[in-house]
Amino acid sequence: MSLAEVRHDWQKAQIEALFALPMNDLLFKAHSIHRETFDPNEVQISRLLSIKTGACPEDCKYCPQSARYDTGLEKERLLEIDKVLTEAKSAKAAGASRFCMGAAWRNPRDKDMPYLTQMVKDVRALGMETCMTLGMLSSEQAGKLADAGLDYYNHNLDTSPEYYGDVITTRTYQSRLDTLTNVRASGMKVCSGGIVGMGEKATDRAGLLQQLANLEQHPDSVPINMLVKVAGTPFENIDDLDPLEFVRTIAVARILMPKSRVRLSAGRESMSDELQSMCFFAGANSIFYGCKLLTTPNPEENDDMSLFRRLGLHPEQGPQANIENDSALLAKASAKQDKSTKQFFDAAAL
């Protein structure tokens, strides 16, 4: 009988019981499921680029990009497509199979869409999977991104419904669920997870995973972030989470969503190699690669590759792993750009 049963009817008490298992029992269960559904030594690598930084109107208490907090972050306008392509090419050459683009918006404006869809098309021409995180999406906007070929859309739930109001007040939990519905209906793959270490209780971590696991279809990718405390944000002095509770969250996510990629996301820069190793054993099989995640630090690429070698892990090969034709692909992508790229850029500016 398969251990990797896909369910959408998890009760919170059942999830809390998993969290309460002795660590050895929890890790054994999670790793057994992980080994049944994935190559246990393969890790999918994504690169995340901030294509528009700062000045976000939302009040997420963890976020240095909120315009409501003085974090010293300088706002930047939307990046030109050629700069995005340069970063995407570099990411692919470094071993990333997916390129994620994030903008600090509540939601994209309709006049931004032609520019964003062109960006998607040009990055895909390099032979990479594409992902964007732009805030809330209407069904029409989701459809346009899907038509452009966007593979994944990220929109995190952040935490449990019960704790959500302590984290953010400018966007409802239901609006996040609605965006996920719009993304899934468009045919794109869903990337959705949350953040732990924000002062929530263990029952909130269970509640977050319950929401994700009980979606009509599990997210294809589930990023689990450890809070990165940033000076100037309301959460800068919040108590640290026990690292073993982070491992438990990874393990339970693997059990509840056996066929989803579980991404070891923000916060790795402060994690020991030993802690990351436990997370990989518990079922994490995706990371963000590169020295920065939007505006927060991330391990250096060489450090990640060194850890992979020591653990016997290897990167997942992307849809076009052979990079010999990168120059031709990049030239093709550049040639496909609309001659009015500057017009697109001006229209999408702050």
From Swiss-Prot:
Domain Radical SAM core: 41-268
Catalytic activity: (4R,5S)-dethiobiotin + (sulfur carrier)-SH + 2 reduced [2Fe-2S]-[ferredoxin] + 2 S-adenosyl-L-methionine = (sulfur carrier)-H + biotin + 2 5'-deoxyadenosine + 2 L-methionine + 2 oxidized [2Fe-2S]-[ferredoxin]
Disulfide bridge partners, by residue number: none
InterPro entries, per database record: Aldolase_TIM, BATS_dom, Biotin_synth/BioAB, Biotin_synthase, Elp3/MiaA/NifB-like_rSAM, rSAM
Chain positions recorded as [4Fe-4S] cluster binding sites: C56, C60, C63
SMART domains the UniProt entry points to: BATS, Elp3
Cofactor or coenzyme needed: [4Fe-4S] cluster; [2Fe-2S] cluster
Cofactor binding mode and count: Binds 1 [4Fe-4S] cluster. The cluster is coordinated with 3 cysteines and an exchangeable S-adenosyl-L-methionine.
EC code: 2.8.1.6
Function: Catalyzes the conversion of dethiobiotin (DTB) to biotin by the insertion of a sulfur atom into dethiobiotin via a radical-based mechanism.
Similarity section: Belongs to the radical SAM superfamily. Biotin synthase family.
Protein name: Biotin synthase
Origin species: Shewanella frigidimarina (strain NCIMB 400)
Gene from which this protein is expressed: bioB
